[in-house]
Amino acid sequence: MIKEIKVAGIKLYNYNVFENLARIAKNLEANVFTTIEEIDMKTILLAKEDESVKEVLESLDVTVFSEAGVLDAIGEATILRRAEIERREFFLQFMKIVEHSGYTVYIIGKDQKEIAAVSQYLADEFSRMKVSGLVALDEIDGEDYGIINDINTLAPDIILSVLPSPIQEKFLKEYKPMLLAKIWYGVGKGKIAGTRLTIGAKIMKKFRKLELLRYVQEGKENEET
């Protein structure tokens, strides 16, 4: 398995669940702030159009693919990797570690509805998890510095972001140097709390996969010329 890949011109790490967890553990031991993000086809396509999103994705310490279609596009979706992605193996294993280690979690999202759903899910599935704070960007007036102050006052171990892209990437890019935490985990909007795809969303997912395949093919043709 290739550990560093290029998808539609974007350089990303391609490690399995246990390799990613080992990388995180090593950074924790060295007291190094670690950035993690779940990446799907929509995120890749956004990065094609937005240089700031691409910059953030390429700077991540750990990339977790949340759709097998990303690896399908470059022929790297093995049976094992596909199973990991479909079972959300990284998310579940990581959250179990967070819960059992007693790490504190700060949840940041765009709206109160998403925050409430995620909080309830974590309480149901990881009952011993310590949520030290939460915030919805839609409820904040003016600059985001109040959020940064709140985060740094609480000094959580994990910042769990359920912000949608590209808001998530732009927030991380702007405020990463200011954050007092051990780990930033950008899950993205709608990926927690058992959210199901609507028929319309399933159609869009197939469309994005076809578009991503086109970008990959164009990249190969450019390399050959």
Language-model features, listed with the residues they occupy:
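Structural motif
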Residues: 62, 104, 157-158
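A charged, well-structured terminal subsegment
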Residues: 213-225
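Short, flexible loop segments at boundaries between secondary-structure elements
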Residues: 137-142, 180-213
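N-terminal nucleotide/polyanion-binding subdomain common to many enzyme families
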Residues: 1-83
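A short, gly/pro- and small-residue-rich
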Residues: 53-59, 169-191
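Short glycine-rich anion-binding loops that position phosphate/pyrophosphate groups of nucleotides
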Residues: 41-42, 69, 163-167, 190
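Proline-aspartate-enriched helix->loop->beta-strand connector
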Residues: 151-165, 181
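Conserved beta-alpha
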Residues: 71-144, 150, 154, 225
